[in-house]
């Protein structure tokens, strides 16, 4: 009867994934419990919501607290297993006929209390076996939590690096075509400059593409090393107390060294190549713009939406108290118009044109078709440029000083210029602009 009860008790404390005692146990929504490391590895590639490994029921929540009750019960079960192991004749001290309850850190041996105080071992560090094992197991779990965060961070970077490499070629092809179209509007004498501009663009494309490829390979290799280390730590945690203490070695130091030199994503950036006469030509259509300023609590989610798009996460809470929006007093519906705005003192900004209907909406979304905007967002220490309709990244250096906006209703296009560099940032394809618009400016300090 006692044997049946003991077997049933052990079964309830066993993870169905690894078939060992639960380590850092968590109980998910359906009521089943697993080792946190086992669940992390099981759900690593799963889409949200993930399914329970036991009953396959969807689990909308993926972040759980440690089940303290189960953890304490597992500690009791481990203690019982340890005492069963120590009760064998082999674990009785031949000299003092006492149970070997102490562990010597120096020679990794089990000692009775009297031997641990002897002249031979007196200078060594020794601890009660169960206390030492639990202490080291907790250190391993702490290291695993750190390691898992790095695994996830590296996985996100790996995905983003692959995505950037995929977008990179298409981005450069579009930029080359845009540059050709712009030179067609200028004097034929600039043909040599156009050729040099495109050659420089192609050279930068090749160099940065190789950087992206090398970076992706490094991240992929680091991902394998991190997971191998995580698996090794997990296997160590699952070992019985005595085996854990004897086999521990330098595993913690090795796991710390794996965390060093984490590969960082490449921030690809093309040089803003000048186009002779670009700003001079557009200045013929220059207009003065006056703005109606709007209070900061207007429900505009431009930067939050773009950050969500960039990092493929849910809406991010962002303090908008330092942002303000402004709309042009004048509506444009025909002709050609050019103006400039100063963005030198802003970290995050958006400028361009929008439809009146977009302004009136309660929640202005960045993926709306009623706006043609150039956005600049600071993420960590890097500035990202994007345009809307659709949301599209531009891997080109951030403009300093003034940005030019050119409306051309004859071709149905909107263009953005780096005025300081006399460079074209982006020009929408002909036929994109088909409705009346007014200037828009949104800026802030972060």
Swiss-Prot record:
Entry GO terms, CC: centrosome; cytoplasm
GO molecular function: ubiquitin protein ligase activity; zinc ion binding
GO biological process: innate immune response; regulation of gene expression
Zinc finger map (B box-type): 88-129
Entry's induction text: By DUX4 during herpesvirus infection.
Annotated SUPFAM superfamilies: B-box zinc-binding domain (SSF57845), Concanavalin A-like lectins/glucanases (SSF49899), RING/U-box (SSF57850)
First and last residues of each zinc finger (RING-type): 15-56
Residue sites binding Zn(2+) per the record: 93, 96, 115, 121
Subcellular location: Cytoplasm, Cytoskeleton, Microtubule organizing center, Centrosome
Coiled coil ranges: 129-158, 190-220
Domain of life: Eukaryota
Pfam families attached to this UniProt entry: SPRY, zf-C3HC4_4
InterPro entries hit by this protein: B30.2/SPRY, B30.2/SPRY_sf, Butyrophylin_SPRY, ConA-like_dom_sf, SPRY_dom, TRIM/RBCC, Znf_B-box, Znf_RING
Every B30.2/SPRY domain range: 269-446
Keywords annotated in UniProt: Coiled coil, Cytoplasm, Cytoskeleton, Metal-binding, Zinc, Zinc-finger
Family named by the database record: Belongs to the TRIM/RBCC family.
Role: E3 ligase that regulates nuclear lamina integrity and the association of viral chromatin with transcriptionally-active host chromatin. Acts thereby as a herpesvirus-specific antiviral factor and mediates the ubiquitination-dependent proteasomal degradation of PCNT.
Protein name from the UniProt record: Tripartite motif-containing protein 43
Lineage, broadest ranks: Eukaryota, Metazoa, Chordata, Craniata, Vertebrata
């Amino acid at each position: 009867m006692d044997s049946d009860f003991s077997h049933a008790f052990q079964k309830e404390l066993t993870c169905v994934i690894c078939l060992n005692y639960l380590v850092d146990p968590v109980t998910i929504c359906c009521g089943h419990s697993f080792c946190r490391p086992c669940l992390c590895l099981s759900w690593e590639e799963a889409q949200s919501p993930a399914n329970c490994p036991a009953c396959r029921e969807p689990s909308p929540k993926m972040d759980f607290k440690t089940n303290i009750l189960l953890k304490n019960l597992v500690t009791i079960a481990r203690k019982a297993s340890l005492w069963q192991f120590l009760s064998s004749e082999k674990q009785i001290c031949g000299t003092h006929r006492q149970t070997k309850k102490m562990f010597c850190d120096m020679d990794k041996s089990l000692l009775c209390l009297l031997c641990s105080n002897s002249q031979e071992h007196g200078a060594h560090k020794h601890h009660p076996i169960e206390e030492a094992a639990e202490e080291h197991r907790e250190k391993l779990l702490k290291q695993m939590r750190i390691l898992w965060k790095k695994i996830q961070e590296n996985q996100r970077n790996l995905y983003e690096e692959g995505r950037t490499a995929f977008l990179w070629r298409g981005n450069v092809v579009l930029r080359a075509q845009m540059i050709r179209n712009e030179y067609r509007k200028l004097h034929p004498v600039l043909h040599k400059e156009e050729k040099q501009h495109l050659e420089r663009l192609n050279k930068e494309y090749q160099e940065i593409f190789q950087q992206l490829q090398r970076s992706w390979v490094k991240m992929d290799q680091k991902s394998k090393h991190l997971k191998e280390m995580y698996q090794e730590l997990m296997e160590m945690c699952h070992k019985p107390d005595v085996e854990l203490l004897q086999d521990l070695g330098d595993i913690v130091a090795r796991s710390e060294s794996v965390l060093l030199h984490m590969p960082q994503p490449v921030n690809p950036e093309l040089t803003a190549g000048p186009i002779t006469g670009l700003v001079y030509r557009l200045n013929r259509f220059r207009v003065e713009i006056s703005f109606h300023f709007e209070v900061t609590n207007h429900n505009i989610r431009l930067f939050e939406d773009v950050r969500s798009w960039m990092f493929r996460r849910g809406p991010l809470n962002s303090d908008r108290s330092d942002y303000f929006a402004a709309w042009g007093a004048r509506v444009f519906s025909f002709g050609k118009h050019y103006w400039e705005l100063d963005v030198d003192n802003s970290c995050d900004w958006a400028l361009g044109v929008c439809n009146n209907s977009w302004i009136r909406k309660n929640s202005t979304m960045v993926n709306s078709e009623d706006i043609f905007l150039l956005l600049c967002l600071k993420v960590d220490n890097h500035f990202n440029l994007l345009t809307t309709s659709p949301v599209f990244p531009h891997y080109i250096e951030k403009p300093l000083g003034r940005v030019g906006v050119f409306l051309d209703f004859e071709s149905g296009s909107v263009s953005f210029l780096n005025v300081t560099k006399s460079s074209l940032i982006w020009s929408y394809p002909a036929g994109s602009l088909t409705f009346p618009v007014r200037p828009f400016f949104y800026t802030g300090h972060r």
